[in-house]
């Protein structure tokens, strides 16, 4: 299975996250954010902090990189709430 994976440390809270985008189907991609330990191992693979499904590769990659960049500088709870509403 192909995908993108990034390790992110939030500057405001020092929390660590793993952002993952994988291909779930022919035209279905899923981006998930997992809370991570100090060594960037996901704390729970079955319960991601946020999950976003998209229908094109370009849209999935844009979502992945936008989440990665914003998660570095913004408060995670606000960011997750914003993305959950859209």
Language model segments and positions:
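Membrane-helix boundary/juxtamembrane interface motif
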Residues: 24, 32-34, 61, 65, ...
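Short arginine-rich
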Residues: 65-80
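Short N-terminal "domain-start" leader segments
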Residues: 1-33, 38
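A short, exposed loop/beta-hairpin motif centered on an aromatic-Gly-Thr core
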Residues: 39-66
């Amino acid at each position: 299975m192909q995908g993108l994976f990034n390790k992110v440390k939030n500057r405001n809270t020092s929390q660590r996250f793993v952002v993952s985008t994988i291909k779930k189907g022919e035209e279905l991609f899923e981006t998930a954010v997992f809370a991570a330990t100090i060594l960037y191992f996901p704390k729970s693979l079955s319960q991601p902090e946020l999950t976003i499904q998209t229908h094109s590769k370009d849209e999935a990659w844009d979502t992945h990189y936008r989440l990665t960049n914003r998660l570095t500088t913004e408060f995670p709870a606000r960011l997750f709430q914003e993305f959950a509403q859209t």
